[in-house]
A protein has these predicted regions:
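Intrinsically disordered, low-complexity glycine/charged-rich regulatory or linker segments
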Residues: 1-144, 236-240, 248-375, 382, ...
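Conserved SAM-binding motif I beta-strand of class I
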Residues: 168-174, 194, 396-402
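S-adenosyl-L-methionine
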Residues: 182-206, 410-432
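Conserved beta-strand signature within the Rossmann-like core of class I S-adenosyl-L-methionine
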Residues: 231-235, 242, 466-475
Length: 520
């Protein structure tokens, strides 16, 4: 078989590429996650499960092949039906059905997995669990709380239930040998990423989520500290006071020292609220306080390969980022966030620009805006304008902000959207076949000096579902090279004018072919 095309991108030189077919990866790579690959775990230590953090392969170990789908793979069930069921052949792992059947997470029935909404902490179903939580936190009902993070998410039943209540949750779980949790969540159409609370900050900015949830996550909080010491506003933690009263009391004391107020508790749900009053932090700034205040050497918003530290970052008082100062959902989507009040004009222009662009996209891709497209990624956004323009569609959007560009991810969360830091010179923290649509706007123009186009496009192919779409908006310098490599990945692409019909950039609307491995 011919060797894959090699493209060296130069910002001022048009790459010349001939279409060459990429080979298929071996079938045992059908769920390959390059930066969280269990095959490479033995190279890293077990301290605080650091081997489950991101460890990307060097360039000489990168795969230059197409990841095959499982034998019998079908197009995913469409939303909202997918919230309750998925095709077994798309995620053919029986272990969770066999090992967790008594917890009612999911069950296999014929050719499908069904999701009844159960779990270890949901004996009466996740709906009753969230009803109790809403009784404890009334702000979950009125649009005050819009974004949440769920650590150790299982099959994301909590996040799925919250979608019906207007709350958008990022479900987080590590890659494990069972190859299940995040993959099931995304197959259901629920936002999720691979990740673990270990030695590195999560890839989010400070003061981003409105609420954090952890259900039986089995973390010794009083030894390492809760996961919300630098970003979250609400925190729900499941406690068994009768069995662990001493640990619970220690946790309360630790959170008090971090300026969290014990807010409410009922049954096995305990809730703390993060203070928005900096007077508390002033009282803790004495030399012998624990945890101590952080110095100014590390940006609190930095979240890409930043080591966790045992210290507190004081929220910026002038910005008033507490929930009581934020507009309620959905108003907050269109209000200029306080983080960029000096750039209000630019924010409004960005919002108008993306409304025009998305209208044009829909004329070229009629599936955009209907149930065929559920899981969407905007690969290099600024303020989340593309996602905001799709807010009334059945889709949710993972907004990606470059770890090497303008740090605007906090603005995206202030709007009530979700996103993540990422560097596209590396693989994304997700399983193969997890997104229906990938959108990029000038990514290769921005990153041509760092990232090899071939590897970026192969990563796009890995995470795009068969028969999924890509909208690629790029400079004419790169558009033909992208089209040539896409042909070698078995994509069908068509070139179009932009909404302005300008010649300096073009659109590629691509669709990935559904194919099966010859070895299966």
């Amino acid at each position: 078989m011919d060797a894959p095309p090699i493209v060296q991108m130069k910002s001022k030189v048009t790459p010349q590429v001939k279409p060459v077919a990429f080979p298929e990866c071996n079938s045992d790579y059908q769920d390959y996650t390059p930066c969280t690959d269990p095959r490479r775990w033995r190279k890293y230590g077990n301290y605080r499960l650091t081997h489950m953090e991101r460890h990307c392969p060097p360039i000489y170990e990168r795969k230059e092949c197409l990841v095959p789908p499982p034998d019998g793979y079908k197009q995913p069930i469409r939303w909202p039906k997918s919230k309750h069921e998925c095709w077994y052949r798309n995620v053919p792992y029986d272990w969770i059905n066999n090992k967790k059947s008594n917890q009612n997470w999911l069950r296999k029935q014929g050719e499908k997995f069904l999701f009844p909404g159960g779990g270890t902490m949901f004996p009466r179903g996740v709906g009753a669990y969230v009803d109790l939580m809403q009784d404890l936190i009334p702000e979950m009902k009125d649009g005050t709380i819009r974004t949440a993070i769920d650590t150790g998410c299982g099959v994301a039943s909590w996040g799925a239930d919250l979608l019906d209540r207007g709350i958008l949750t990022v479900s987080l779980a590590p890659r494990d040998n069972h190859q299940a949790q995040v993959q099931f969540a995304l197959e259901r159409g629920i936002p999720a990423i691979l990740g673990i609370l270990s030695t590195q900050r999560l890839p989010f900015p400070a003061n981003s989520f409105d609420m954090a949830h952890c259900s039986r996550c089995l973390i010794p909080w009083t030894e390492f500290g809760p996961p919300i010491n630098y970003k979250n506003r609400w925190h729900g933690w499941n406690a068994t006071v009768e069995e662990q009263k001493a640990d619970f009391d220690k946790l309360k004391e630790l959170l008090r020292s971090m300026c969290f107020q014990f807010y409410n508790m009922k049954n096995d749900i305990a809730v703390w609220q993060k203070s928005s009053d900096n007077n508390c932090y002033d009282q803790l700034s004495v030399s012998n306080s624990y945890p101590p205040m952080c110095d100014d050497s590390v940006d609190p918003d930095a979240g890409w390969y930043i080591p966790l530290r045992t210290c507190l970052s004081i929220p910026p008082q002038k910005l008033k980022l507490g929930l009581e100062f934020s507009p309620k959902w959905p108003d907050r989507l269109h209000v200029t966030p306080k983080r960029i009040t000096s750039r209000a004009g630019r924010f409004k222009n960005d919002e108008s620009k993306w409304k025009r662009r998305v209208r044009h996209y829909k004329t070229l891709l009629p599936a955009l805006g209907n149930e065929e497209i559920r899981n969407v990624m905007d690969m290099n956004t600024l303020y989340g304008g593309f996602a905001a323009s799709l807010i009334n569609s059945p889709a949710w959007v993972m907004n990606v902000v470059s770890s090497n560009g303008i740090n605007s991810l906090g603005v995206i969360y202030d709007r009530g959207l979700i996103g993540i830091y990422h560097d596209w010179c590396e693989a994304f923290s997700t399983y193969p076949r997890t997104y229906d649509l990938l959108h990029l706007d000038g990514l290769f123009t921005a990153e041509s000096h760092r990232c090899d186009m071939k590897y970026v496009l192969l990563e796009m192919d890995r995470i795009l579902r068969p028969k999924g779409y890509a909208i690629i908006r790029e400079s004419n310098v790169f558009i033909d090279a992208i089209a040539a490599i896409s042909t070698g990945m078995r994509w069908n692409c068509q070139k179009h004018d932009t909404e302005y019909e300008v010649q300096k950039e073009k659109l590629l609307i691509c669709r990935k072919k559904l194919w099966y491995s010859k070895a299966q």
